[in-house]
Each structure stands twice: as C-alpha cells, then as structure tokens.
C-alpha cells in the first residue's frame, strides 16, 4: 500500500480522478455505485487501469477484478481489504450424500396471465369463475407486418387471429430495474415481463432483494422465441449496442441474475412447450446437488408476429373456432397464448428451518425425449409412459395414490388421446373403482402458453 492510498476513500478519489482524466468522464457523471462499463470503460481501458493499480498498490490487480467488483465503491473495498484466508474463500458446501431425493418446497409464486390475472390468487378466482381469456389478436400487434400490398393483406386475412393476449406489454418501469430508457427500448418484452413477475414472486415468498445479493441463487427460465429480436433488427440503422443482449434468449435468465446480483446457475431453457417444467426440474436438481441454495424457476411467452401463427395454420394445428377443447370429441386444435409464471424453490429442510411458508412440495420429476416417433413433432406414447413411471418412481409415490393430474391437454385430436392413454397405462392400473383419477387442463381457460404453459398448470 502506498503512502498516498491509505483507505477506501483515498482509492475512490484516485479512481474518480483517473476516470475524469483518462476515460473522459466529467466529475458530475461519476457515480461511485455505477458500473465501470456504464461509466465508459472498455476492455482495453481495463487492461491499462489494472497495470496502473498494480504499480500504485504494489500488488497484482487483474482486469477481471473490474468485472467481479464492477463499481468504484466495490472495487475500492476489494482492493483495500486484507488478503482473505484461502481456506475461507468458499463457504462450506452441503454434503450431497442422501440429498438427491430431498423434497423441494415451493415458497413463492408470481404470474401474469391474460384476463387481468396478476397473481396466483387472481388465477384461482378466474378458474373458479369458469372464465376464458381467449379473444382476437389486438389490431396493433400485426400492423407492422401489413405493408399495404394486396398479397400481404390476403395472407394476414387467412391467418388465425384467435389467441390469449396480455394487455400493455410495452409498459415497463425501467428506472425501477435500473435500466436506461435506451436499453429498455431494445429489450425483448419477455425479459421485461420476467423481471416484473420474478420480483412479485419474491415478494410473495417474503424475500427481500437485498438479502439475495451475492447468494447462491439459481435462475432457470423457460422461453422459446425472441420474435422481438428479429423484428427490431430488420432496420440496420436502428441496431445499437443494446440490440444483441436485448434479443438474446440466454439473457432472459441472465438479466434477472444480473439485476439481483445472484451467483448461482443462470440458465435459459428451450424445450418448446415443456420449457418451464424442465426449468423447474433443473432448478430442483440444482438445489439437491447444492449448486444453488434458492432457485427461481420461470416460463415466459409473448406472441409478437403472425409468422408462427401462419406456420401452425399450414399444418392445421390451430383451432379455427378459437376454443381449446382439451379431451373433447369436438377438439379442433389449440389456441396460442401469452403469459409468465415464476416459482421460488428451496430445499424443504431449509424452508422449515427458516420458517418459510410452504405452498407445495415437489417430491420428484423426470425428463425424457420422444426419440424417433411418427414424425419430428409427433408424440411418442411409449416415451410418455416411460417419463411418467420414472417421475413417480423418483417421487417414491405409488401411481394409485395420485388423485389429480394437471395435464398438457392441448385440445388436439392426436395429442390428447395419446396423453390420456399414457395416463391410463401408468395411473389407471390397479386403481379401485371408488378412487377415480381426475384430470384437468388450464389451456381451456388460458390457451396454450407454449414456453409458459407448464408453469401455468403448475401454479394452478
């Protein structure tokens, strides 16, 4: 330590002067809690500054330190602090022996679904009222794609317009989430929506954001498409430094981890309409292996373009009547929908220790793939039977003990019978006549939320 730098305040003052002199900041622009990147420091600048600090402090300073401690205050505190004891660098890790079967507690939930649904209680009331949120696509959604030509107008007129849509998807409080208006404008609204609903889920769990900083909290977010990224990049003159992160699928999870300063896994999951359930599965596994001590699992889906509607129309998948009739002889296809759902998960023993409200318990889950079936998009009955058996085995639950299943239930003439047969093969055998298996499908109320479909059923 040099004589001129004896405290954090001294180093903060030196860093401010350095930024003003070498990076071009004005003193008024330098916020001690703003990231160095936001203050204009590039990777090349970081290399130069690390050399200056190494000479100044008489110890090695790496450019990586600026990313691990990204603000002036954080960097100064790190560089002035005594060297840590190597044995205390990492917290003691939980033994995983015997933990792989530990139940997982659901301690918080949040959701935003069509029909004015802004939380789990509102969803339950919506279902009890036997309501449906399905309607016509808002006119402004497809205006961008109508170039005025007769050909395009004819194509749009022949495209299914039924869906389940959220209102005000362009509304976002960027200041609350510490995002500039310019960056927010380039963000996929799915990123914005997930930030909002995740915050609500943490509030529902009674967890403050400050308590999560630098914690081993994982984020697992299901999403399928970033139509916004494709739309926003069609005009090259409007592409800027925020465009890549604004439209990247990986950032849907990473954005939340960044905002809350979470240090656990941060994974975007795309397995089509199972995305959010696979996200929950991965979150549970992460908790059981102690990669995370708390996990946020989510799914989000918005419908911004007529292109996917048209693609589904070409194979006759969408309902021309605008009804998602699950397990109904009159089923004529599914209805696409929007929404977001988030659950906060914790090991049951930890939740009980901490006095958390336990809303539900996940005892087991399983994931597989159809493999070679009757076409790339065709379900495989044998694979469905196998994944059900594995899930109940992992949960140590006899199938005959199950009295209700929230199904996929898309309302398609092929998918629903295959799912019903698989359920019957696994859950129907050996069942007493006075112990029927009840099934349901939230898609009849909300439509098929695709990447958020599984978590909508889970929250129900």
Language-model region placement:
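Internal signal-anchor transmembrane helix that establishes type II topology
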Residues: 96-100
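Interdomain regulatory linker/hinge segments that flank or connect interaction modules
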Residues: 1-2, 333
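Condensing-enzyme catalytic core of the thiolase-fold
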Residues: 101-460
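Phosphopantetheine-dependent thiolation modules in NRPS/PKS and related acyl-activating systems
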Residues: 2-94
């Amino acid at each position: 330590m040099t004589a001129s730098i004896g405290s954090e305040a001294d180093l903060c003052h030196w860093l401010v002067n350095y930024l003003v002199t070498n990076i071009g900041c004005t003193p008024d622009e330098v916020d001690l809690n703003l990231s160095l990147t936001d203050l204009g420091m590039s990777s090349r600048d970081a290399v130069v500054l690390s050399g200056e600090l190494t000479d100044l402090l008489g110890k090695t300073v790496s450019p990586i330190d600026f990313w691990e401690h990204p603000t002036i205050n954080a960097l100064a505190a790190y560089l002035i602090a005594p060297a840590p004891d190597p044995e205390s660098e990492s917290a003691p890790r939980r033994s995983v022996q015997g933990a792989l079967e530990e139940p997982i507690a659901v301690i918080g939930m949040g959701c935003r679904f069509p029909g004015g649904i802004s939380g789990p209680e509102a969803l339950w009331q919506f279902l009890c009222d036997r309501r449906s949120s399905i309607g016509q696509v808002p006119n402004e959604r497809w205006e961008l794609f109508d170039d005025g030509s007769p050909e395009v107008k004819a194509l749009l007129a022949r495209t299914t317009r039924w869906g389940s849509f959220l209102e005000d998807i362009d509304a976002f409080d960027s200041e609350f989430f510490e995002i500039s208006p310019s960056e927010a404008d380039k963000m996929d609204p799915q990123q914005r929506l997930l930030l909002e609903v995740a915050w609500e889920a943490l509030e529902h769990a009674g967890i403050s954001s400050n308590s999560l900083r630098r914690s081993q909290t994982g984020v697992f977010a299901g999403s399928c498409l970033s139509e916004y990224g494709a739309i926003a990049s069609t005009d090259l003159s409007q592409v800027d430094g925020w465009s890549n992160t604004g439209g990247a699928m990986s950032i849907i999870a990473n954005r939340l981890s960044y905002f809350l300063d979470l240090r656990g896994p941060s994974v975007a999951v795309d397995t089509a309409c199972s995305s959010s359930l696979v996200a929950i599965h991965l979150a549970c596994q992460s908790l059981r292996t102690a990669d995370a001590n708390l996990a946020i699992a989510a799914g989000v889906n918005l419908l911004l373009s007529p292109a996917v509607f048209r693609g589904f129309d070409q194979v006759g998948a969408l309902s021309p009547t605008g009804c998602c009739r699950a397990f109904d002889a009159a089923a004529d296809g599914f209805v696409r929908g929007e929404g977001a759902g988030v659950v906060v998960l914790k090991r049951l023993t930890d939740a009980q220790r901490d006095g958390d409200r336990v809303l539900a318990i996940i005892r087991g889950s399983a994931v597989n793939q159809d493999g070679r079936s009757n076409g790339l998009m065709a379900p495989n009955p044998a694979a469905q039977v196998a994944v059900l058996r594995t899930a109940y085995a992992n949960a140590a639950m006899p199938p005959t003990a199950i009295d209700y299943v929230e199904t996929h239930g898309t309302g398609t003439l092929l998918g629903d019978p295959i799912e019903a047969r698989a359920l019957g093969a696994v859950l129907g055998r050996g069942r007493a006549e006075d112990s029927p298996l009840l099934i349901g499908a939230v898609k009849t109320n909300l439509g098929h939320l695709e990447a958020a479909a599984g978590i909508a059923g889970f929250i129900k």
